[in-house]
């Protein structure tokens, strides 16, 4: 599938995906979904997208990390919201698998570790009912390592938002499950959607902390 076909597939999934099982797999059932087929120790790359170092989504990433490490997994983390990752300029210099003219920023860390990771976790706050610009910039830069990321991997995602309307979150769930994962050939390993989280620290003591922890244990 070329770049244009991928974009069309992802947009179609985001815009028109039916409200199916993905909605029901948020929260506690995410850990159950992740428990199937996830045996063995793994290298897990976490990519977060919040510009707030101690925001709610990053706190859930911490809990996921705790669960994963307690199970014996190696965890490597890239906080895109606190790094310098420039957006893809569509120059095609890389030819979908090669040197990127922007690789003097922080993206080479992702390039290095995603090649050897058996699992990837995406963590993002929801801004205007989509993922953050910071994490989207990382995903778009996958174009330069398109062959590398087309490999057998498990992947999960964590989303946080102030609203509690799950129907509005479904297009993001579809983007990951029906768009990105289908294109890359990655195995879906579960997700957590933390709703009703507005101020920093709102997630502390919530059920989402345990759900993120168990997702990490079962990645």
For the regions a language model picked out, list residue spans one by one.
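Residues within the helices of the helix-turn-helix
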Residues: 4
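Short, glycine-/small-residue-rich phosphate/pyrophosphate-handling segment
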Residues: 150-188
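Short, solvent-exposed coil/turn elements at secondary-structure transition points
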Residues: 81-83, 161, 194-197
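Hydrophobic/aromatic beta-strand patches that form the interior of the parallel beta-sheet core
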Residues: 45-47, 76-78, 156-159, 189-192
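Glycine-rich phosphate/pyrophosphate-binding loop and the adjoining helix
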Residues: 180-219
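N-terminal beta1-alpha1-beta2 submodule of the flavodoxin-like/Rossmannoid cofactor-binding fold
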Residues: 7, 11-123, 129-145, 204-219
